[in-house]
């Protein structure tokens, strides 16, 4: 009701010019007698409905009563200074009334305005949204309508949203500070003892174990490759030495094959000249010469027999008086040749000593 009266006074003051704005005398407005009576009745009703407001609105009631008694007397509109003083004087009563109103409420009721469960004392009147049909004091029902109910509900909704955001902000700050402190503790004590610390260590070990396994496998592969390469190198060195030996043996075998080919050609020629050699040898035997040969004897180590592998020939130191002086008689078909051959001479002398 106080707000409604303030609005009426402000409207009347805006319609009438003040003394400071114009030098003319203040305009007079004659209020009807029925309007003054209604205002006085409303004052009395408000005083009876809310006893806490009797003292605050006593002066206003007297002012309205004086206006009603004078009737057509000129009424001066309140100045802005008087309105401010009146608003300041009314603040303590509103604060105590708001505190009385909030004393019977819980936090959950404030946070859920759509389903209110407010249990107020019988003597307290709620300054919340009131409908014109009923609820609250009679003065509130007279002066407030559906628009005021919707505005009050919107204000209460905003108030509950603000409280919810404040609570969420406090909870978020506390949770973030707790998480930050826990993270700092874990960083300061990496091996520190706690359930979370041990779980973190287990997670770190689980993430590091595949890396360690991969590094160990790579190192093992490198060692295996190195060992394999070293084995190949040693095998190559051994095969190179063996190859050299085989090459030397191949050369020796090549020489032996060549000697065998020459000997085979020589023996084929002897067999081809068998008849002439047989007649010559028969005549020599008739002359009284003894025929000898080294064909059926084992050749000595220094023999140059081409059918046998050639070894290191040892030079036999022969005495001067034992030196052989024989000659080689070569019969080739119809031709007979005498050759001087030391090897044949040694064979001949060795056969004579038998």
Curated annotation (Swiss-Prot):
Region (Disordered) location: 1-95, 113-156, 171-214
InterPro entries associated with the record: bZIP, bZIP_sf
Feature: compositional bias, Low complexity: 121-132, 205-214
UniProt keywords, alphabetically: Nucleus, Phosphoprotein, Transcription, Transcription regulation
Chief location: nucleus
Stated consequence of mutating residue 304 to A: Significantly reduced binding to HCFC1
Modification sites for Phosphoserine: 50
GO CC aspect terms: chromatin; mitochondrion; nucleoplasm; nucleus; RNA polymerase II transcription regulator complex
Comp. bias regions, Gly residues: 133-143, 190-199
Positions of the UniProt region annotated as Leucine-zipper: 232-267
Lineage top rank: taxon: Eukaryota
Domain bZIP: 204-267
SUPFAM superfamilies assigned: Leucine zipper domain
Keyword Mitochondrion: no
GO molecular function: DNA binding; DNA-binding transcription factor activity, RNA polymerase II-specific; identical protein binding
A Pfam family per the record: bZIP_1
Residue numbers spanned by region Basic motif: 219-226
GO BP term, example: ATF6-mediated unfolded protein response
Tissue note: In adults, expressed most abundantly in heart, liver and skeletal muscle, moderately abundant in kidney and pancreas, and barely detectable in lung. In fetal tissues, expressed most abundantly in kidney and very low amounts in heart, lung and liver.
Short sequence motif HCFC1-binding motif (HBM): positions: 303-306
Compartment(s) where it occurs, according to its Swiss-Prot or TrEMBL record: Nucleus
Family: Belongs to the bZIP family. ATF subfamily.
Oligomer status and interactors: Interacts with HCFC1; the interaction inhibits CREB3 transcriptional activity. Interacts with CREB3; the interaction occurs only in combination with HCFC1.
Any further remark recorded for this protein: Named 'Zhangfei' after a legendary Chinese warrior who was contemporary with Luman in around 220 AD.
Stated role: Strongly activates transcription when bound to HCFC1. Suppresses the expression of HSV proteins in cells infected with the virus in a HCFC1-dependent manner. Also suppresses the HCFC1-dependent transcriptional activation by CREB3 and reduces the amount of CREB3 in the cell. Able to down-regulate expression of some cellular genes in CREBZF-expressing cells.
Protein name as it appears in the record: CREB/ATF bZIP transcription factor
Organism: Homo sapiens (Human)
